[in-house]
Amino acid sequence: METYNVFCGQHNLRSLPPSEQTLILFATHIASFSSHSNVKLHLSAVKHYAVIQNNYIPFKDFHRLYLLLRGIKRSQGRSRSLPKRLPITPSLLRIIKLNLFNSSRLFEDKVMIWAAITTAFFGFLRISEYTSPKKTSHDPSTTLLFNDLALKTHSATVHIKTSKTDPFRHGVTIRLQANNTDLCPVHALRAYCAIHPTRSGPLFSFRNGSFLTRADINNILKSTSNGAANISSHSLRIGAASTAAAMGYPKYLIQSMGRWSSDCFRRYIRISDATIYKASRAMATCNIPVPLSYDPCS
């Protein structure tokens, strides 16, 4: 709703009850930088807020708005079907780690940041699931806390209290296994816990007491990835899905590990040129007998 209220304020529009023309202008504004589905999400938020404020919005009578949404969907086509963000793969993770630990940050903060990054990657976490909304305040009912982490000898569990696909906050426990590599999330978490002074509040916090936020992760990834373009916090989740697919993991496993409610995870997977080359080579050298007939529908 903040986006909507700011938009109305900037253009001197009445926010409640919203007219069809106001919603058309707002939808056009959102569509200029986001997807059709996100436009619908923003409009749903406006509708919900209006109902709370006892303002009824006759969406079914807003025919021009309906036609606009159809037009946005058609005009975007598949141009937004693949996120533009670069996936962070294990090779890029190692570059990020090297640059992070060679930076001038406090050692305790480096260890904390690395623990957060590896946990996010191997846990397929969304940014909201492991960061705090603000630097100095948090909501204990939604923020990942220190007591949501359980460390064992060769594994760790992280309890996520709420997420995008868990609107009723049933919660889910993410299992991390030690992998005996330089990217091991369990080792990173154990190293972080060994030097962290407190055991309360958000799991990931800086030495000065401030909490790790989405903006922090975005800035850190951009500054440690050797100038890689289109890096963001979501690049970790995209990279995890792409890496799992490249390793040949079945789609049901990728969907389960990432907690996707549908097969939309496929749009996160990036297929490298090397993979396409190997597939092309394999197809060209495969000695399959010539079939007597071919049915493309079979």
Regions found by a protein language model. Give the residues of each.
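Extended, non-catalytic subsegments within catalytic or DNA/protein-binding/adaptor domains
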Residues: M1-S298
